[in-house]
Amino acid sequence: MKVVTVCGMGFGTSLMLLMDVQAIGKKHGYDIQGEAVDLGSAKGKECDFMVASGEIASELDGESVEVVAINNLLDKEEIERKVMPVIERVAKGVK
């Protein structure tokens, strides 16, 4: 499955989120490919779901895939709690 992680510039925050999401997926037996991008590049990207900070996620309304909003980017438990249900739905083919 493929995730797109999004931040304002497409470097720091989105790359950190991508590594966290991939590690969480691996921990639960899922292979997650991904791309870290800036907000402008995210719109219309081909993926199964997106992950972004709460502020950025609100800018992604209207995307055809689910956008997971993370409030505390340093809270790995929050990331796992919010991302795992989406990973499991995508793995089952449920959108």
Label each residue range with its predicted role.
Residues D38-L39, A52-S58:
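Short, polar loop motifs at secondary-structure junctions
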Residues A42-E46, A57-E66:
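Short loop/helix-cap segments at secondary-structure boundaries that form the rim of catalytic
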Residues V37-S41, E46, E78:
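Short acidic active-site motifs
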Residues K2-S41:
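Conserved active-site segments centered on acidic
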Residues G34, C47-S53:
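Short, hydrophobic beta-strand segments that form beta-sheet elements in well-ordered domains
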Residues E66-K95:
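Ser/Thr/Gly-rich flexible loops in soluble cytosolic domains mediating phosphotransfer, phosphorylation
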